[in-house]
Amino acid sequence: KDAFSECVELKEILLPPKVTEIEDRAFYRCKDLKSVHFPEGLKRIGREAFYFCSMETLKLPESVEILDEKAFFKCTWLTEVCLPVHIRRIEKWVFHGGNRLKVLEIRHDPEYIGEWIINRAARIRCYQGSKVDKYCQESGFTVEYIDGE
């Protein structure tokens, strides 16, 4: 927990293959952190793990199952994120505060989606008729449908 919290000089990290969990607030307010290389086998990204970091792209491994509350809160440089299909839980405010985020793509139905996972200005790309679609309708998020495959 808080391993590199507020380490303002940190710009890039290559996480070792044995890392299966990123603890709460591990890279909290690492304002210059632009690049993170996540290992396959990573299961959970903790609460506020990358709060207020500067990543422009986010490539999560397919092994990720849990995005905890505010994991990428105020990551203002992200513009588009496509979530891996094995994510079971997307906790509240995961990508909220990312003012440049335009699209969050969710191509599957997670077991749980928390409130306010994105800002109102962003949209969620999903399949029509999915649980994610229903979540968007109930929460008032703009939806962009993925063409059937």
Residue spans for each PLM region:
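Consensus positions within tandem repeat domains that build extended binding/scaffold surfaces
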Residues: 1-5, 23-28, 46-49, 68-71, ...
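Structural signature of tandem-repeat unit edges
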Residues: 7-21, 31-44, 53-66, 76-89, ...
